[in-house]
């Protein structure tokens, strides 16, 4: 077995995500079972670093990005600067309400946002409002298992505004979605690599990045090697189910 190169380690998050079901280029799916078609109007609410937006633009979708954080919005726009299919718009907003018309979107992507908002019921209602009848929804929040594991070691600010205001249990997450009027079509979990990464990061203490790399780099090398073994896919699925970083719902608006 060969050692991971620095480039291998740089690409490990993307590799792990792809093996979880994200960024399925050949199938035109942002996540397994969530197709993005040319011409679709996609809303990326809480666009973060722009990875989801970039994929959707590459699929030929029309994309509107939104985030409460001007830094995140800027990151997304820099990432897709010069793209032959640029975003239709970029909105700095707390999404309460979303400054968009009713029923405009074919697909709504909202990853790792709901745990941050003060009123998740009102927030999800806004996501439903802006979707067309039949619109597709990809929603993720942190999994309760890793959130509970982090409680004793995370920085206090991790569970304070503007960070994680709540831990959503699996049944509560699904209920939030269905009571907003959406139909749940699939559920999944993923991200064990990041669960363990964050536990190591908290162990490093506040002196980032000096004390961080000696802990997380060996972990990244171990995970890269594990994925390359014959049992790697089974091992990944086992741990993604056991200690996932995130839980995911694919849903549809009736109509």
Task: Give the location of each predicted region.
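Short, glycine-/aromatic-enriched active-site segment of Class I SAM-dependent methyltransferases
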Residues: 142-166, 175
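C-terminal helical/coil "lid" or tail adjacent to the Rossmann-like core of SAM-dependent
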Residues: 194-229
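A short glycine-rich, Lys/Arg-flanked "PGG" loop and its adjoining helix->strand segment in the class I
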Residues: 121-136
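Alpha/beta-hydrolase-fold catalytic nucleophile elbow
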Residues: 140-142, 190
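Conserved N-terminal segment of class I S-adenosyl-L-methionine
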Residues: 1-101, 107-111, 121-124, 188-190, ...
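Residues lining the SAM
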Residues: 111-114, 140
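Conserved S-adenosyl-L-methionine
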Residues: 182-193
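A short hydrophobic/small-residue beta-strand
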Residues: 63, 137-138
């Amino acid at each position: 077995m060969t050692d991971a190169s620095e480039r291998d380690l740089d690409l490990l998050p993307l590799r792990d995500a792809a093996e979880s079901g994200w960024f399925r280029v050949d199938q035109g799916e942002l996540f397994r079972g969530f197709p993005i078609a040319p011409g679709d109007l996609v809303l990326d609410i809480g666009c973060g670093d722009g990875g989801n937006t970039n994929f959707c633009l590459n699929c030929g979708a029309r994309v509107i990005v939104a985030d409460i954080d001007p830094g995140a919005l800027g990151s997304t726009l820099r990432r897709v600067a010069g793209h032959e299919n640029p975003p239709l718009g970029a909105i700095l907003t707390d999404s309460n309400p979303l400054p968009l018309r009713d029923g405009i979107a074919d697909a709504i992507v909202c990853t790792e946002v709901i745990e941050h908002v003060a009123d998740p019921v009102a927030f999800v209602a806004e996501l439903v409002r802006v979707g067309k009848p039949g619109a597709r929804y990809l929603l993720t929040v942190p999994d309760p298992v890793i959130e509970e594991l982090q409680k004793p070691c995370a920085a206090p600010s991790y569970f304070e505004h503007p960070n994680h205001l709540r831990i959503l249990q699996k049944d509560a997450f699904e209920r939030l979605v269905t009571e907003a009027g959406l139909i749940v079509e699939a559920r999944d979990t993923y991200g064990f690599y990041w669960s363990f990464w964050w536990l190591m990061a908290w162990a490093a203490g506040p002196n980032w990045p000096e004390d961080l790399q000696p802990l997380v780099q060996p972990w990244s090398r171990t995970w890269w090697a594990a994925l390359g073994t014959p049992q790697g896919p089974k091992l990944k699925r086992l741990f993604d189910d056991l200690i996932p970083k995130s839980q995911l719902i694919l849903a549809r608006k009736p109509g």
